[in-house]
Amino acid sequence: MKIKFRALLATVLMGGLLVSGCGANQPEPVVPEGSQEIVISNAEKVETDYDCIVVDGSPEGISAAISAARNGLKTLLICQDAALGGLYTLGELNFIDVPESRSGQLLVGGIYKEFSDAVGGSGFDIIKAKNTFYQMVANEDNLTLRVNSRFKKPLMDGQTITGIEVEEDGKNVKYHAPVVIDATPDGNVCAAADVPYTFAGEDIGERDREMGVTLVFRLSGVDWDKVTAHVTKIPEGETAAEGDVNGNLAWGYSKEGFAYEPTDEAMRLRGFNIARQDNGDVLLNALIIFDVDALDPASCAEGIARGEAELPMIIDYMRAHCEGFEKATLVNTAEQLYVRETRHMECEKMLTIDDVLENRAQEDAICVTNYPVDVQATKTQRFGTVVGFPDQYEISFGSLVPKKVDGLMIVGRSAGFTSLAAGSARIVPTGMACGQAAGVAAKLCVDKDMTPRELYGNEKGIKKMQKPLEKQGALLAHQETEEPVMSHWAYEGLKVIRSMGYADGGYDNNYRLDDEVTGPRFCNLVNLAIKKSGLSLEERVTVSKEPDNAEMLLALSAKVAGLEGVAAPTDFEGATAFFEERKVLDQTLSKKFADGQATADAGSCYMLAARLYEHLLTQPNAIKYVAINDLSK
């Protein structure tokens, strides 16, 4: 049974001072017992003018609002849902991706850690998380919460945002503030304010590269002891178990997941991330759904319906093939989909894939974090890929400052991250750290009568922001780490290809640069370079499975000659001269490909493809994508 709980958000008259919120001046919230959930309702009267407005009740938005309130700003938190927590609660994604360095050091503290400690870390109980988020908000005197409040449009004065218009109880209401923080997962406020953005992999020419979304589902009747025994069992002939267990978390069943054949072709089951709840139920993050337009509510609803239609077959399959799930029964699905990527807003500083994988520091750092660059499966690519795994990197305050519009900041997965960098930076703990920084920045902006953009360009202001951040628990100590691959002679070529989205270093950052190249790998590299230049790829470069240098250079020179409208070389010496003339082969690369009967290593082919790309950019109608590096820098 749910307890009806008044939100305690009324404006209180106290000694002539109006205090909005539900903190120390109000009765303490009653903590419900067991699985009982606090039900939030809005106060009947609320002010319309604030110092800071935060849009969305996501974890990132909650962190931003609490931070702004703690720093003395009269803050309004707008939540379109009836409960707080977004992806963590309504999406039921309770498998926290905890940013830790390779030495095991926690990288994100502050408000994120307060929440994590309160709910017991990763694998938290969903109802406990909802109540914890509410109580964290309720404790802040300066913070007013509005639930079931749907953002409609920004209020603009030229290129400056001055507030927002929302819909509450069927009525349009306007709220005003000098600083607005967009914490919506998709950057809805920024987009409505006409901040430029790219979609999915558009910044590298892959706008249609939409990672699948996930529908988390809850099962009862799962034998936890069998599950943990299964995922930790070392199969015969193997040296390690497929999965593992950590408290209420278990992961594994990859073979079983990928072996499932869905009735819906635009769907896939992968390995299971399993989280046990306080009542013994388990939550599963395993079902990938494609062909969902995550910016369209109707498409998202259809995606959930498709997932729910597939689940009876999935559960039958699990009962028959997955140890520990023999008596599993579906309880429910999450209210919202787990969406990994939509918009990437253009900000003053865009976090790049090299920032991430070279563990770079930032002068205006507002958090330190890490996570594998995890690009999940797409409809055309059955398996996802891990581009690399950083030790730790910093995020710039400029990544929270959208271009074109003043008075606005953005936190969450749609902030100023290029599409590949977002594969790492999109996780919620990182977003909560950015949210906390945005709250501190809002305080400085209000006190100094400056915009976030002006603060970004103010060195003294940045230092004034970093000091209170650290005092309030943020972790800004960064350890510079140079990855071994960065000293490889072919690393500059790898960087170019990696920034195109074609490099799989895995969790150990091993790009196999010294391996002898295979025919398919060579073709993938050079065809990618041609494709990314925007030139014709009607006929792909093809070679045998085990080509020698002569075969590779002749096949490639024939394609490039065709693109340029010139005669193709007819022998190995001619192909070598062809590429030397175009500076695709420099002195070092010429030596690597000098023996026509030998086969170059992968590093040489990465350099060849990168230099080919640079050459092709000189051709008419070539395209230079903004997120792709080049060798001339």
What is each model feature region?
Residues 25, 499-633:
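Terminal recognition/anchoring or ligand-binding modules at protein termini
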Residues 39-43, 47-49, 67, 73-74, ...:
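Conserved N-terminal/central alpha/beta ligand/cofactor-binding core
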Residues 18-21:
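C-terminal motif of bacterial Sec signal peptides marking the signal peptidase cleavage site
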